[in-house]
Amino acid sequence: MNPPSSIKHYLQFKDFSLEEYEYLLDRSAILKAKFKNYETWHPLHDRTLAMIFEKNSTRTRLSFEAGIHQLGGHAVFLNTRDSQLGRGEPIEDAAQVISRMTDIIMIRTFGQEIIERFAAHSRVPVINGLTNEYHPCQVLADIFTFIEQRGPIKGKTVTWVGDANNMAYTWVQAAEILGFRFHFSAPKGYQLDPAMVADSALPFVHVFENPLEACDGAHLVTTDVWTSMGYEAENEARKKAFGDWMVTEAMMQRAQPDALFMHCLPAHRGEEVEAAVIDGKQSVVWDEAENRLHVQKALMEYLLCGRY
């Protein structure tokens, strides 16, 4: 073990270097193998993970809670509706208190500025479980799933069909760091915000008006719900706007013959993806969902213990 010399947070995908991701992806495979072989591994014995949820989730809570347990620690669930965070306690104060009683903190919230402010006042590592702007743990799991199924992602093409949401912006950061092409297609009014795309990422990002063309030659086609949490009032308008951006078998046929399909779930069959695609032979959504568990274990282990 080579413990970290200072506190490190994971708030955006760009917070880690290529070399760190190479380590984390390798480590994820090792920890997954331990899990499959029923091998006990408790590097986080008696460590406590605080899980703060302002946005509800099934996969995020289950994967983090099971993950810290499998590493020998335990989790404390904090819902903002049931804590002082939901009664107006300043974020800075909450960070000071919670980080004095726990070893690592995961937050799933709305604005990115909330988690940035929290981390700035935390004495322990903070992990972004999801914000409106970024979802780094999910994209890390997706990349691990791709590598597991198809090998290195460098030089490959990842196509995003759908809203410019937290997943899309995280894929933009990942493309620059890991060196793959990112094809993006969404209807007008739902495009990538130039202010959210670094100039250094532009050579890796290619925007298409036609979603079929965006899928040409893709090694991975991925999407998400048309209406993210917090945007429910726009649901009907989004359904009308995104009608041509459902991932279909025709789109998958434009991709590479061995292309994969991913969706971070939950999915709405018949909206953002055809049932024949998500339930078809190219879909790896269940492996993708499971791999949240393994990459997050590698992440927590790295943030608290450094490298093995």
From Swiss-Prot:
Superkingdom, taxonomy of origin: Bacteria
Entry binding sites for carbamoyl phosphate: S57, T58, R59, T60, Q84, R108, H135, P136, C137, Q138, C264, L265, R292
EC number per UniProt: 2.1.3.3
Keyword Ribonucleoprotein appears in the UniProt entry: no
Enzyme class (EC, first level): transferase
One Gene Ontology CC term in the entry: cytoplasm
Keywords associated with the record: Arginine metabolism, Cytoplasm, Transferase
Pathway membership, UniProt: Amino-acid degradation; L-arginine degradation via ADI pathway; carbamoyl phosphate from L-arginine: step 2/2
Localization (cell): Cytoplasm
Catalysed conversion reaction: carbamoyl phosphate + L-ornithine = L-citrulline + phosphate + H(+)
Pfam families assigned to the protein according to its UniProt record, in alphabetical order: OTCace, OTCace_N
Main location: cytoplasm
GO biological process: arginine biosynthetic process via ornithine; arginine catabolic process to ornithine; citrulline biosynthetic process
Similarity comment: Belongs to the aspartate/ornithine carbamoyltransferase superfamily. OTCase family.
Protein's name according to its UniProt entry: Ornithine carbamoyltransferase
Organism of this sequence: Ralstonia pickettii (strain 12J)
Lineage of the species this protein comes from: Bacteria, Pseudomonadati, Pseudomonadota, Betaproteobacteria, Burkholderiales
